């Protein structure tokens, strides 16, 4: 009994020590990550047109459900999960940061693969990016302040929400606007450049995430047991919660699948940039964000493969079945 209590105390001490860990990521690599993320956004924007948003606005309910699920429900569910699991404060902050990031555009690929509504997915992703300029610092600050430990840790960094807002605007808003402008003015060039640019930038971004883990492998190996399972549950909650909310709202199956991926696939690249720009590479936050960036691809492939083999019913048939 005493031995077990001693082991539990040691486990708790090791788990809490992650709040003191700072990951190794030099300023040059940090600048490179910022540039790569901007290139990812620019590459995505080369394939966006104002007409794409007009198409999405024909189904405003589905668009609104997707944005509410992503920016309001998921952060709230994340806070509830943190309160239930009670991880180390830096891990909890990492979970909140991931939940507050915009949707990752690989969600569009998973939606298409899962036979969801791709145009809805693209619209939610893009509007989510724009909304995140305000919603990311707002959600992180609001939900962290609801817990004394996370709030104290957040205050220790003297975080300026306006500074974070400005950085997100530069990393997302400027490349997005530049890409859409080039797409409108030079459509032939944008069409040729979009594919190679998107593939190249995404591969480099994944390389940065993997590289960050490799450089800090000893730290990850020591603390992985505190993060891996939590990220799995967190991601599953996001995917299931997005789908369940869309179903409860009365959306058709294709739209439900889109909302599921738009809620459960996050822009972890932006999250990693923010961890190093504003939180000094805080161990728990960085490990959660980096591991999420790997795991949500695995989970997205599994779920999209499952749905790919189960074509959604046509809208009329689905309504008839519910009746």
Per-region residue spans from a language model:
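Alpha-helical transmembrane segments of multi-pass small-molecule/ion transporters
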Residues: 4, 10-323
